[in-house]
Design a protein with these regions (language model features):
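Transmembrane beta-barrel wall of Gram-negative outer-membrane proteins
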Residues: 33-108, 125-130, 136-137, 176-180
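Aromatic- and acidic-residue-enriched carbohydrate-binding clefts of CAZyme catalytic domains
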Residues: 219-231
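Conserved small-residue
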Residues: 1-23, 273, 278-290, 494, ...
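Extracellular/periplasmic, surface-exposed regions of secreted and cell-surface proteins
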Residues: 10-13, 42, 77, 83-92, ...
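A generic structural motif
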Residues: 65-69, 355-357, 512, 601-602, ...
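Residues embedded in well-ordered regular secondary structure
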Residues: 1-71, 109-112, 138-156, 160-170, ...
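C-terminal beta-signal and adjacent terminal beta-strands/loops
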Residues: 34-35, 388, 613-704, 729-775, ...
């Protein structure tokens, strides 16, 4: 912008331009420090309990406050939980529980993502001028004007994220109430009835306000031309939502032992549940935060208002309020049977059918069931000689079916009403588009599951091993597929896919230290899961879609990087052996370079924990690890060559080549590149100006981003120390002198450190622009 002599830089000499270019380098803003803070939270709980042989009670009061990670954000919550259990006679038990909570959150409206802004904003931009006023960011929304084009105008005061945080707000108030009643009646000695009834009510009210001088308000001016008008007005979006739900369950339970060797337990019951949710919203322009009133903007006095403009104005007003209603109902009937012979052989059988109004009329009920077998080998006589070192051994297997409801689809025709009406002299007609075509054959997703597991204990259970092998197959999974446009739709979601998961999991728990004063335990587990798409009926299924039969979900299909061409400065890729490369079209066809490179879902995962204690002092830690997950480490910049808005001469294959992403902040290693004068092959590829010199890359190699992204593919394996906790419980004889029943203090750290070769910010959340925050917690527990 400076060298081009554009705008306020017009007429500057080279020396003056040099001075202007050098000036920003004299200042560096750490935007993460400006926008974020060390969050301090506190939580307090007080509980009371007591009772007699026939009745007990429990009451808990809680308060928590969290000053958010983002400045100007905070969260408060008040809660009360109570429970009373009554036993009026030997046959009847009753209980009633009530939980209430009220929470309040405050923050900015979030019209601009502060995490993304902090990552990409240029460090030479300033949050404030020397006089304390807001300093306008000259680059974040100005890539077009910086390159001689025409940007959408900004407010006269410019864009400044600190102003957005100070003069926009999002206030949310939430109240929830849950009532639960249960009853158990011993009808006979071995027959009982168990019932449960619950009711929940949740209400949420939010106000989203944008001050008139903010960029958020500037972007939301439906009554004005965005290019010619400079008029601004504040706005507020207010919404109110409530949800009420219920659950009723009743079951008969019979159990008995015969001849001291047969034990049987059976359940027969049913359950109904449902929910009703309603949401109402309204938006007001010209809102005054002092009085709470609003004055809706009208066209300027000298504006010629024809019928078309009047219709547009009415359409805007019509869309300023609305409501939505959701209602769901479910019914279930179930039966279970457990049989134990000689405490060695166990059989479990379950059967149930569930019904939902989320499916077609003849598909609403889904029968499922399971069968399980277990053998307690350690109860056999031949096991006696082994008990000196193996204390327990059991073998279990199970087979069954379950059902799942995919709430993203509906059997009914769903219409999205637009925010305007078609007006006539006599009436107004709603206008909408069909979002979801009817599907009376929509049905449950069904999963067949079988498992085989082994449990073994050694040395009086000081060491315990569990191993499990499983196979899980889901049929009628809902997938979005392309359909013939003659149907009136380009795609539709219905029951079309079959998925399969196969895996093993091993866990080991041990007590390695056990004396009068010392104790120590450790555990670790590792799991391997392989999933694949067995069936997918779609005309567009293929490698390029990332959805292909025989491959895992989350598959990554891209190119195999061979290195940087020293002559051209671009990445070259391995060619598929089953295709020919005779023409430029062959060399540019991305499918000729496409390979399966792995999956974003790591096949190996696990965790570990360690606990060591000495008398009342205890130290524990825990963590997790993941092996061989893959991720394209490419955080999309808010700007690129397309943002300039001109016709390109040469298409950069991927963001890593694009000159115009350097308009905003980039990684330090972006300067390490191949250049014609320094043809490095151990750094980043060349910079490509989409509007500069024609290179003709597509004559040599594919320009597809799908292939070019392979250069940013990384392994996101990691090992993480997730938590570290130190606690101390004061000696009972000591605290009694203070009139206390118990006293303990604790200190906990979370998200401590991660070991990884991933070059991004956080391998646990790859692609994020801010890592999971490290947390420190100090706690005190007092009992009276």
């Amino acid at each position: 912008m400076i060298r081009s002599g554009y705008g306020k830089y017009a007429g500057l000499s080279k020396e003056e331009q040099d001075a202007e270019i050098e000036r920003p380098g004299q200042h560096s803003t750490n935007w993460f420090d400006e926008l974020f803070r060390n969050s301090v939270s506190q939580s307090h709980n007080l509980s009371l309990s007591g009772g007699s042989e026939k009745s007990t009670y429990y009451i808990s009061l809680g308060y928590s406050k969290n000053n958010g990670l983002v400045k100007k954000s905070e969260y408060d919550r008040y809660s009360i939980a109570s429970k009373i259990d009554i036993k009026p006679n030997k046959r009847v038990k009753m209980g009633l529980a009530a939980d209430m909570g009220w929470q309040r959150s405050r923050g900015s409206s979030g019209s601009v993502d502060p995490f993304k802004y902090a990552y990409f904003a240029n460090p030479y931009e300033r949050p404030y001028n020397d006089d304390g006023s807001y300093s306008a960011d000259r680059t974040y929304y100005s890539i077009r004007s910086a390159n001689g084009g025409l940007d959408l105008p900004l407010p006269e005061v410019g864009f400044n994220l600190m102003r957005e945080m100070d003069h926009t707000s999002l206030k949310d108030n939430n109240f929830n109430l849950t009532l639960i009643g249960n009853m158990s009646v011993n009808i006979l000695e071995n027959l009982s009835f168990e019932g449960l009834a619950s009711f929940s009510y949740v209400t949420d009210n939010s106000d989203n306000f944008n001050g008139k001088d903010t960029y958020a308000a500037w972007q939301d001016r439906p009554f004005d031309d965005p290019f010619t008008s400079k008029r601004t007005y504040s706005n507020i979006m207010q919404s109110s939502t409530y949800n009420r739900s219920y659950n009723l369950r009743g079951q008969l339970h019979y159990f008995n032992t015969f001849n001291d060797i047969h034990y049987i337990s059976t359940l027969l019951g049913s359950e109904i549940r449902g929910q009703y949710a309603k949401s109402i919203f309204t938006k007001r322009y010209g809102y005054d935060p002092v009085t709470g009133n609003s004055a809706i903007p009208i066209y300027p006095e000298d504006t010629s208002v024809d019928y078309e403009k009047l219709q547009r104005y009415a359409s805007i007003v019509d869309g300023l309020s609305g409501q939505s209603i959701v209602e769901d109902k479910f019914a279930s009937f179930y039966f279970s049977l457990d049989y134990v012979l000689l405490k060695r052989y166990i059989l479990s059988f379950t059967a149930r059918t569930d019904g939902s109004n989320n499916f077609g009329n003849d598909q609403q009920f889904n029968p499922t069931g399971s069968l399980g077998l277990a053998w307690n080998i350690d109860q056999e006589k031949f096991f006696e000689p082994l008990k000196k070192w193996m204390s327990s051994l059991s073998l279990r297997s199970s087979f069954g079916y379950t059902g799942n409801i995919n709430k993203s689809v509906s059997p009914k025709l769903i219409m999205d009403y637009l925010g305007r009406l078609r007006q006539t002299d006599e009436c107004s007609y709603r206008i909408g588009v069909i979002k979801n075509p009817p599907n009376p054959k929509l049905r449950w997703e069904k999963t067949r599951d079988w498992k085989l597991s082994l449990d073994a204990g050694f040395f009086n259970e000081r060491l315990h091993f569990t191993g499990e092998f499983y196979n899980r197959r889901t049929t009628d999974a809902v997938s979005n597929v392309k359909v013939a446009r003659t149907t009136g739709f380009s795609d539709q979601a219905y029951n079309t896919s079959t998925l399969e998961n196969t895996g093993v999991e091993f866990s080991l728990t041990g007590t390695f230290l056990k004396t009068k004063d010392w104790r120590g335990t450790a555990s670790a587990n590792i799991a391997y899961n392989y999933n694949k798409l067995v069936d997918y009926n779609s005309s567009v299924s293929g490698l390029s879609t990332g959805v292909h039969k025989g491959y895992p979900l989350g598959s990554i299909f891209s190119g195999k990087v061979q290195g940087i061409d020293p002559q051209l400065g671009i990445y070259t890729y391995e060619r598929r052996p089953d295709v020919s490369f005779e023409t430029a079209a062959d060399r540019n066809n991305y499918a000729n370079y496409l390979f399966y490179l792995g999956t974003s879902n790591a096949p190996w995962n696990g965790g570990y924990s360690l606990s060591v204690g000495y008398k009342q002092l205890n130290l524990s830690l825990g963590g997790s690890y993941s092996i061989n997950g893959k991720k394209i480490n490419n955080i999309k910049s808010p700007v690129n060559y397309i943002s300039v808005g001109s016709s390109s001469v040469e298409t950069p294959p991927a963001q890593i080549y694009d000159l115009y992403v350097n308009h905003l902040n980039v990684r330090k290693d972006a300067t390490e590149r191949w250049t014609p004068t320094n043809p490095r092959t151990d750094a980043n590829p060349r910079i490509i100006d989409a509007f500069g010199e024609f290179i003709g890359l597509k004559n040599y190699i594919t320009s597809s981003e799908t292939i070019a992204n392979a250069s940013m593919l990384e392994n996101v394996s990691y090992c993480k120390l997730s938590s570290l906790s130190l606690s101390y419980g004061f000696n009972e004889s000591l605290i009694k002198r203070w009139g206390l029943g118990s006293l303990a203090v604790s200190f906990t750290m979370n998200n401590i450190f991660t070991i990884t070769n991933y070059s991004g910010i956080d391998p646990e959340t790859p692609g994020a622009v801010y890592p999971l925050a490290r947390q420190f917690t100090f706690g005190v527990a007092v009992g009276l």
